[in-house]
Amino acid sequence: LDAHTKVDVRAELQELLAGLEIPTLLVTHDFEDAAALADQVGVIVEGRLRQTGTPVDLVAHPADPFVASFTGANLLHGQPDGAEANTTRVRLEDGTVISTTDHGEGAVTLAVYPWDVTISRTRPDDSATNVISGAITAVTELGNRARVTIGPLSAEITVDSLRRLGLEHGQQAFASFKATGTRIVASKGGTP
């Protein structure tokens, strides 16, 4: 379906399902549809049930990288590189060090959601402890919001912010996010 029709159909389905008092099974490949229409979501991979829960639970506690990616997360890969206070430092494959409030051992995969990432033209001076700098590799306008990609991270910002910051493909920029905005979703040394 085109984007406009999809929104209309989703709204009609929400209304229809709200009036039913029977369990209903919906099948979709779109997490936004699942989140909008379902009380409970089951993620099936290669014929096996990978995780079930509310849409909020799946985003807050994805069972593995596939579920995190399905729910919209950016995935970062690295190795734990020490700890301080209540955070673990993770050295990414490119050498960048990220802080997370989660703990893991061995090779880890971190999930960072686009709505937790802030984009700026200058190095941020705020409470976001994690900063990745680089050239903007993609800018995609999605109606009233835009997706901006820097290195391994995509951020979702308003189109007003995109215009105000003057962000364009190829420009140098900074993507920042808090340690609390990361989740370890895979750990070679055991369950995160």
Language-model features, listed with the residues they occupy:
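Nucleotide phosphate-binding site architecture
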Residues: 32, 50, 56-59, 68, ...
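ABC ATPase nucleotide-binding domains
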Residues: 1-63
